[in-house]
């Protein structure tokens, strides 16, 4: 059985992953190497978004446990109208903002708060 590759570690305690499809295909996203932060593997994201591809155009995406932002940025890359990312770790939220700026992600909102509190 093959084992999923873990994202490569890069400088400054950051790791990277790639966006699989859409307008940002093959672009790299950086995220902090934090305990418990495990991005959704490429193969899982590819399968999920292949299923959802006809449903994404114009939808508003809410990612409650954003982490690396992989799921949300993938959705925005593939045609979602807007994206709201909630990440309770303030350092990772800053990293998500940097990635959104790098991608010129219009319609992306990043909130640094606990999703359970935000949902109340």
Describe the role of every protein-language-model region.
Residues 1-120:
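Class I S-adenosyl-L-methionine-dependent methyltransferase catalytic core
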